């Protein structure tokens, strides 16, 4: 993502570069916000001789007051729907699709938290390209790390199940199927193999033999669990601290654990009103907000008080996000307890 902020006009122009950029955009836009983009409208022309109408779509620049956003995880488009507020089509409904390569102009005075949030995408700190293969003797799951979640890429069965599994199971074919699926994923720079039993290490050795993976950093870790749980646990382990500790999901996991650990000591609080009171007292060190609460109008009141405080926006699509939502979407870690 590239952004250009005009302080005088209170506009932000965004060049969308990746799929993940769409998630960031979704979380700073709300109904009522104004955007500018290119829409394709039909112009009617009357043929005087045939008295018929023909139509064609032409690109026009329009300003839209947003009514709704349609964002689907792991897709390359976001759909913005609203009402045109200027020009010949003023008052008419319009939708615009945005994806990588498009430019979006927002007429909005972004607050400090929203700017910091967009700067994550600008710095490309959590770019895609990190793949996890989590497996055991029965099945393998392949995940692509996104900024906001793990994307399911493939599920491969080994056929090593049932009383007569030995008639169907072929370990070599199992590994070949996994490797074939991995080769279909583009722009990978880090591949992490994890899981239980002997299969993860065997797969790792097969991958290392394949010249296709020569330019990819391949790692192997034994874990106590498989699937997404295995990946989440690995993200927060000391074993990977020097490799993936700066991933967004690893940070979310650490922040959540600190919040939960401090609940018993009174150094963690939750709930909008409770946090609002602690902000007034200057006692909050870290403010943790769920993705959907970040977009709420009342949240801006909290953020206006939170200057200089560490703020984390937690994705809805992760385990930490689900837990933060169960606490009402507003959580905080305190500098000190107030009696």
Curated annotation (Swiss-Prot):
Keyword Zinc: no
Source organism (scientific name): Picrophilus torridus (strain ATCC 700027 / DSM 9790 / JCM 10055 / NBRC 100828 / KAW 2/3)
EC numbers: 3.1.-.-
Necessary cofactors: a divalent metal cation
Name of the protein: Protein pelota homolog
Listed GO biological process terms: nonfunctional rRNA decay; nuclear-transcribed mRNA catabolic process, no-go decay; nuclear-transcribed mRNA catabolic process, non-stop decay; ribosome disassembly; RNA surveillance
Compartments, as annotated in UniProt: Cytoplasm
Role according to the record: May function in recognizing stalled ribosomes, interact with stem-loop structures in stalled mRNA molecules, and effect endonucleolytic cleavage of the mRNA. May play a role in the release non-functional ribosomes and degradation of damaged mRNAs. Has endoribonuclease activity.
SMART domains: eRF1_1
UniProt family annotation: Belongs to the eukaryotic release factor 1 family. Pelota subfamily.
Superkingdom of origin organism: Archaea
Cellular component terms per the entry's GO annotation: cytoplasm
